[in-house]
Amino acid sequence: MEQRYLEALEEEKILSTKIMELKNLEKKVNEETGEEYGSYLYSTKINLLELKLNKVKREIKDWEGF
């Protein structure tokens, strides 16, 4: 079970990185187009990854509670 804790920590890092990259892409596209086109393209994916990240963070918190 400790293996899952380590996997969750790694997954948290990966998800955080992906979210940050997508937010940067979103900002770049918005600046290039002068519109909210980047938000249109990336907001759903970012939201889904943030939900998954929150789930992983809760799992990590549960593990740290033991």
Give the ranges of each region predicted by the language model.
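Short, charge/polar-rich alpha-helical segments
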Residues: 1-17, 43
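Amphipathic alpha-helical coiled-coil segments
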Residues: 18-22, 44-66
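Charged, low-complexity interaction regions
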Residues: 28-39
